[in-house]
Regions:
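Flexible, solvent-exposed loop/hinge segments and secondary-structure transition points
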Residues: 1-80, 84-102
Length: 102
């Protein structure tokens, strides 16, 4: 196995945010991308510079906004939603990797 991709939605303020997270074979984040952002504000979470801070994270990593993850002024709900979604995806991928190895 080379890696995994995880596609999901999180709820923004009023609309879903569709995102993808890419993992290596050990469950570490290799990249992430906002596929579709539907809210009128807060679209800065689609910026690849912001998304790059998830690189190398796993389910064991810290995801505290303001220290581990940069906040974005005016995009608090979107930042929280995407961060929670990516963190959740790391748990799902870890579970899948454990199941594969059993």
């Amino acid at each position: 196995m080379i890696g995994l991709a995880y596609l999901d939605n999180v709820k923004g303020k009023s609309q879903p945010i569709t995102y993808a997270v890419f993992f290596d074979s050990q469950g570490m984040v290799e990249g992430s991308h906002i596929i579709k952002y539907r809210e009128p504000i807060g679209g800065e979470v689609s910026n690849q510079y912001w998304l790059n801070q998830f690189f190398g994270k796993s389910w064991e990593s810290d995801y505290k906004i303001g220290s581990d993850i940069d906040g974005i002024s005016g995009a608090t709900i979107s930042v929280n939603a995407v961060t929670r979604g990516i963190h959740r995806s790391t748990y799902i991928v870890e579970y899948l990797l454990i199941q594969k190895n059993e």
